[in-house]
Every structure is written in C-alpha cells, then in structure tokens.
Amino acid sequence: MALAALIAAYHESGEPGALRATLPLAGRTLVERQARLAASAGANPIVIIVERVPPALGTALERLRRDRLPLVVARTAEEAAEAIDPFDRLLLIADGAVADTDQLRSLASVQGEAVLTVPDSGYGEIYERIDGSTRWAGLATVNGALLRDTAGMLRDWDLQSTLLRRALQTGARHIAAEGPVAILDRQSDLAELERRILAGATPAGAGWAGRVLAPLERATTALTMSSPAGPQLIGLASALLTGLAAAAFLYGWLWTGLFKLLLATPLEGAALRLAKLRMQDDVRHSWWAYLLPLFSGAALVALGYALAATQGWGMILLAFVALAFLIALRVESEGRSIRFSILLAERRGMAWLMLPFGLFGLWHAGLAFLTAYSAGSFFWAQREAHSAPAAAQD
C-alpha cells in the first residue's frame, strides 16, 4: 500500500497579506519544509491543495518541482481526490503544521486511521479541539477512499477539518506527539523552530576538523540560507578553490595554495549544512562532492612535487603514501564503529595541520607528519575493526 500526502496551503496567516504556507522558515517557505518532510516519510505523490497561488507560493512550488519532488497542485478537493489512489494511505498535513521526520515516519507506519494529538492545556485555538483533553497537532493518516468520500460531500466546509472529523468518526487512533510539533501562523511562531532546525543541520560523521570549523560553518550557513545560493553553488566554490590550490602548489606558490585549501574547508561544511537544512539529502552524490577528494589528492601530490625541487623526489613518494593510507583508512572504517574515530586523519583536517609547519617554513616536515598521521590512523582503525570480531570469537 503506497503512501501519499495531502498538504493544505490556503489559510491566511496572522501576517497581513501572507498565507501560512509562505511564511519564511530557515531561508525557504513553510510549505517547502512540509513537502520535504512528506517526501522524507516516503510520500508519493505529494498533493498541495490551494485556493490561490500568490507569487511567493508559486516560487516555492517551482523550487520543489526543480528538485524533482512528486508534486501535484490541486485547486479543489475533487482534484486532490483524483490525484490519490483510493487504496493509498494518506498523510494529512494541516495548513502551517510541522513536526520532525521521525514523528511523520512513525505516524505513516501506523495501520489504519490515526491522528497526532497534543494536550488541551498549553495549546491555543489554532489547534483544533478533539475532545475535552486533547487537540489535533495538525497531522493524521487516513485512506484515499475517505478523501474521495469527503470531497463528494464537502460543499463549503473546510477540507482539512472535515477530513479530520470524518477520520475521528471512523474510530481513528489518538497518538500523542512524542516530539516537538507546531502549527505556525505568525512570524513570531517561527523563531524557536528555526533555531532547532539550524542546530540540527550538522552533517553526520563530522571529524575533529568539522567540530573546530563548526562555528564558521554555522555562520556561513546562516548568511546564505535566505539567499538564492544553494548547496550546489557553495560546494562548487569549495571544489574550485581546492582545484586552484592544487595548481598553485604545482607552480610552487605554497602559501597561495594553502590559503585556498583553508578557505575551501568551511565552504564544504557549509554546503553540507545548507543541504541538510533544506532537506536535500542527495547533495553528497553531486558531482562536486566527487571532485573534492580528487582535487584534494591532486593538491597533496602537487605539494610533494613542489617540495621535490629542494628536498628530493622522496617528497612525491610521501604524498602518494599519505594518499594510499587515507584511502585505506576510509575503506577500513566504512560501516564500522571505530573508537576515537573523531581523532583520525581526515581530508579537511590535514590542510589545517599543515598551517603551523608552513608558518615555520617546515613544509617538508609537515608532509612527513601528514604521512605518519595517515599511517597511524589507518593502523588504529584496522586494529579496532578486526580486534572486536576476534575477541567475540574467543
């Protein structure tokens, strides 16, 4: 049984002249967040029901289409019902309602009709009252047939409220919200949610360099989240700077190359954070994400080549050995839990480790250190990865 989503996007907000759907949230609009949450829960299609399409809403819908979300825009309940198979499960998202991904997935997995609830106390009239002790949190699951039946008798009633009432009449389960939920109506409602979204936009698997650069990455993300610049553009800038760094090293411009490398490192992190903020999970498979490791490896080899003129050809060998250990470390660590993995060698961190050696003119010693660091990290990861199974067999 497939999962579809129905998002209401027609109520006026508490802000003059603005729909709830177009309230700005984390650099985009509320309806974009809702649609991406529905997509992350596995919904296809995602039907957005509208009464009018002001420019802000039209722009938001176009951005969603560009990102290839399975979007259907319906202007009437009948159009929405036609877009959804009667045998599909339907995730109903009220106008302005948001929750985290885990709650949506959990609700979508419930068999039969279910509504997400919050306590009556502490929540205002914007949360529809269900009974004497609970209110609707703005999320529910029903079946497509119920939507078709409701569309046929709707007349002038509000679709989301009528669908909720009919689901309750059929005996829908009440499921208490286990995490933060909100129905947003004013600009002032967005501050806390936006803070949580920003705090949660940390890329998974960040090493020690990611922790050190986190404040700079967060600041860059905050500056760019409301701009037209997307993760692809910022990632492209990072890859371009890394490629230019390799070219600078090749010509012997060591400080120029290192400066470009250092500048590229927070941009990469900011691109990943912005992608997570906008729920664009495919950014790690972008072409620039594949170019970055290649350009970084080229920069390391180019540095060895530049140093070979004064330190001998062993510098090039050191660069290739360091690269080999880094690749082996990645293979050895893939899918495994390694103790102290945050301290192991990583591509972005190695650029910053060269900085103190460069300040004292010890570039050759820095390259030797990076090679030793990569080797030590690999052997530690190998020991951790293979000692645990051996201990379990004993």
Give names to the regions the model predicted.
Residues 213-291:
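Core alpha-helical transmembrane segments of integral membrane proteins
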Residues 37-43:
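Short, acidic, metal-binding catalytic loop of nucleotide-sugar glycosyltransferases
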Residues 135-242:
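Conserved alpha/beta core of the MobA/IspD/sugar-nucleotide pyrophosphorylase nucleotidyltransferase superfamily
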Residues 52-104, 221:
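Short phosphate-binding loop-to-helix
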Residues 291-394:
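Generic detector of multi-pass transmembrane helix bundles and their immediately adjacent loops
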Residues 85-86, 97-170, 281-312, 337-352:
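Conserved core of the sugar-phosphate nucleotidyltransferase
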Residues 21-34:
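Short catalytic helix/loop segments, enriched in acidic residues and glycine
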